[in-house]
Amino acid sequence: MAMPNLGDMMKQIQQAGEKMQDVQKQLEKIVAHGEAGGGMVKVSVSGKQKLLSLTIDPDIMDDAEMVQDLVLAAVNNALDESARLAQEEISKVTGGMMNPADILKNLNLGQ
């Protein structure tokens, strides 16, 4: 049984590191959107799972409980979309050689 070539292993590790840097750059470019209540609450989040914007229809501001529920729903919708887009981007960058869920966890972005 042949031993793995150390030079080849080091090259693969370097390539994986470069791909991770590419993934980080691509995640910064992703913007996902979510909404709830038929568009009464809209949010945008980055591919790094950061809230970028929140818009609330002023007509619903009198009902605090409804606003809270709609904000939570819209944020969760946007985060789900962001995770889906991030996994797609990771698959593109890595050519499917690395598990997108594992990469997201390594970047502290996975569930």
UniProtKB/Swiss-Prot annotation:
GO terms for molecular function: DNA binding. Its main location: cytoplasm. One of its GO terms (cellular component) is cytosol. The keyword Lipid metabolism does not apply. It is found in: Cytoplasm, Nucleoid. InterPro entries: YbaB-like_sf (IPR036894), YbaB/EbfC (IPR004401). NCBIfam families: DNA_YbaB_EbfC. HAMAP family: DNA_YbaB_EbfC. This is Nucleoid-associated protein Ppha_1174. It comes from Pelodictyon phaeoclathratiforme (strain DSM 5477 / BU-1).
